[in-house]
Amino acid sequence: MSLMNWFEDKRRFGGLIGAFIEKATKGYIFSEREKDRYIKIDTTKGLWTRCDNCENMLYVRFLRQNKRICEECGYHLQMSSTERIELLIDRGTWYPMDEDMTARDVLKFSDEDSYKNRIAFYQKRTGLTDAIQTGIGQLNGIPIALGVMDFQFMGGSMGSVVGEKITRLIEYATRASMPLIIVCSSGGARMQEGTLSLMQMAKISSVLQIHQAQKRLLYIAILTYPTTGGVTASFGMLGDIIIAEPKAYIAFAGKRVIEQTLRQKIPDGFQVAESLFDHGLLDLIVPRNLLKGVLSEIFELYNAAPCKKFQNSFFK
């Protein structure tokens, strides 16, 4: 095939895809009820993507409909925090908290670019103020407090804003006697904030102790790809029940760092969810499309447990 023929085929194929999208959105292919089940896509970000595991080409519209699970190999691709909220929370019941809280460049940190400029860049890119969304909502009719980290915002790194929003969420859940879920997806503590980011580990752990041990309220940690560093070393592993997605990368330090420190070869796959489950570090590995139903059953079972009675049940 000549180069000119290749360009012509590419142009023609692109036109067919564009016509398909146009017809679909006008209702010629999908009915109004069917269209409501599909999430609108931003065509400026591309119509196709590649699976990180099997490298199969995936059509973005159907990938989002399938909860970002590869239809070829079942691999769970990364989701945004907004998509995860839509996955777990009943429609029309989500009430966000502390949406306007933003980070300050207290240390005046700068490497290739200033910390202030990096924050502004990711805020514009993601539409978020920082690497987590918190709020309250209902999961199959059960009121819950939910925090969802977003890896697309500076690698989901935990700074002072992330730590403060999680702390306030836990305190609210404790006062309201609500179960708590935190979906973890993070590269660890945010280096641009130094010790201010590291102290969030202790701060969050201390309020979790009140929520779990003193008030006997449920906390479920959901570990997704990737969960590493200070998040793994603190609230990521403090859940009454710890759930992971299939093949999620969960670690404190990376494989290369461990090998350089121990000066020995580390086996492949020892930091994936299945390996951690085999060694007793996880309670459940749940596929994304089953997660909401599993959480609902856990809440019902927990509410009936005699050892976990408290004054204000989250069931009416």
Swiss-Prot record:
Keywords on record: ATP-binding, Chloroplast, Fatty acid biosynthesis, Fatty acid metabolism, Lipid biosynthesis, Lipid metabolism, Metal-binding, Nucleotide-binding, Plastid, Transferase, Zinc, Zinc-finger
- Asked if the keyword Nucleus belongs to this entry, the reply reads no
Q: Residue ranges of the C4-type zinc fingers?
A: 51-73
Name the Gene3D superfamilies on file. 2-enoyl-CoA Hydratase, Chain A, domain 1
Task: Name the Enzyme Commission number(s) assigned to this protein.
Answer: 2.1.3.15
- Comment on bound cofactor: Binds 1 zinc ion per subunit.
Xref: InterPro entries:
AcCoA_carboxyl_beta, Acetyl_CoA_COase_Trfase_b_su, ClpP/crotonase-like_dom_sf, COA_CT_N
The record's subcellular locations are:
Plastid, Chloroplast stroma
The catalytic activity, as recorded, is: N(6)-carboxybiotinyl-L-lysyl-[protein] + acetyl-CoA = N(6)-biotinyl-L-lysyl-[protein] + malonyl-CoA
Write down the required cofactor(s): Zn(2+)
**PROSITE patterns, per this entry?**
COA_CT_NTER
The main place the protein resides is plastid
The Gene Ontology biological process annotation of the record reads: fatty acid biosynthetic process; malonyl-CoA biosynthetic process
Give yes or no: UniProt keyword ATP-binding: yes
* CoA carboxyltransferase N-terminal domain: residues covered: 47-316
List the Pfam families: Carboxyl_trans
Q: In which pathway does it act?
A: Lipid metabolism; malonyl-CoA biosynthesis; malonyl-CoA from acetyl-CoA: step 1/1
GO CC entries: acetyl-CoA carboxylase complex; chloroplast stroma
Q: Which GO terms describe its molecular function?
A: acetyl-CoA carboxylase activity; ATP binding; carboxyl- or carbamoyltransferase activity; zinc ion binding
Any idea which positions bind Zn(2+)?
51, 54, 70, 73
Q: What does this protein do?
A: Component of the acetyl coenzyme A carboxylase (ACC) complex. Biotin carboxylase (BC) catalyzes the carboxylation of biotin on its carrier protein (BCCP) and then the CO(2) group is transferred by the transcarboxylase to acetyl-CoA to form malonyl-CoA.
Q: What do we know about how this protein assembles, alone or with others?
A: Acetyl-CoA carboxylase is a heterohexamer composed of biotin carboxyl carrier protein, biotin carboxylase and 2 subunits each of ACCase subunit alpha and ACCase plastid-coded subunit beta (accD).
PANTHER family per record:
ACETYL-COENZYME A CARBOXYLASE CARBOXYL TRANSFERASE SUBUNIT BETA, CHLOROPLASTIC
State the family it belongs to: Belongs to the AccD/PCCB family.
Which named protein is this? Answer: Acetyl-coenzyme A carboxylase carboxyl transferase subunit beta, chloroplastic
